[in-house]
Amino acid sequence: SYGIDCDDNLLSLILAIHEVDGIERIRLGSLEPRIITEKFVQTIAQLPKMCPHFHLSLQSGCNATLKRMNRRYTAEEYYEKCRLLRKYFRNPALTTDVIVGFPGETEEEFAESKAFVDKVDFYETHIFKYSRREGTKAAAMKDQVPDQIKAVRSAELIELSHRKQACLLYTSPS
């Protein structure tokens, strides 16, 4: 994630880009949730070129699954980042990625993740079925989720995502 381990940070880069003539819009994608701080959001909300669209990778709405994925945030911390964006931007489009069927994901964990996706009201959710990749820690984990269960979970989240998106489009001010 740009800005976490580098001397230059993302906010400084955005401010510099904002000053460039000919650049009309700035849109951020695939943000690490830890970058979203009150100072960061407050500052970019003042920039006329900033598009109110933010893609924050969630991966899972269940803390136990996030921990197995070695993510460095909790669902609650992620939700707070979304709240900050909504505090400073009028009707921002929040999009995300969710992985279903990560090793060890139980029905209860999936239900927790699904409820979280429902709660956040994403504009769009990209759903991916976990695929085993040799040489990774996850490939060696016990409790690999069967493909048919991943397919069912994926279909459930896709249906939820489409329903939520339709509601947001229907109720959003023009």
Predicted regions and their residues:
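Catalytic cores of alpha/beta
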Residues: G104-V117
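Conserved SAM/AdoMet-binding glycine-rich loop
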Residues: S1-E107
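Conserved small/polar residues in nucleotide/adenosyl-binding loops
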Residues: Y170-S174
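Contiguous mid-protein beta-loop-alpha structural module that forms a pocket-lining wall or clamp
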Residues: D121
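Radical SAM enzyme [4Fe-4S]-AdoMet core and its adjacent flexible, acidic
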Residues: G3-H18, G22, R68-R72, R132-K164
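Internal alpha/beta loop-helix hairpins
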Residues: E124-S131
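Short, hinge-like loop/turn segments at secondary-structure boundaries
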Residues: I44-Q46, S113, K142-V145
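Conserved functional hotspot residues or short segments at active or partner-binding sites
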Residues: C167
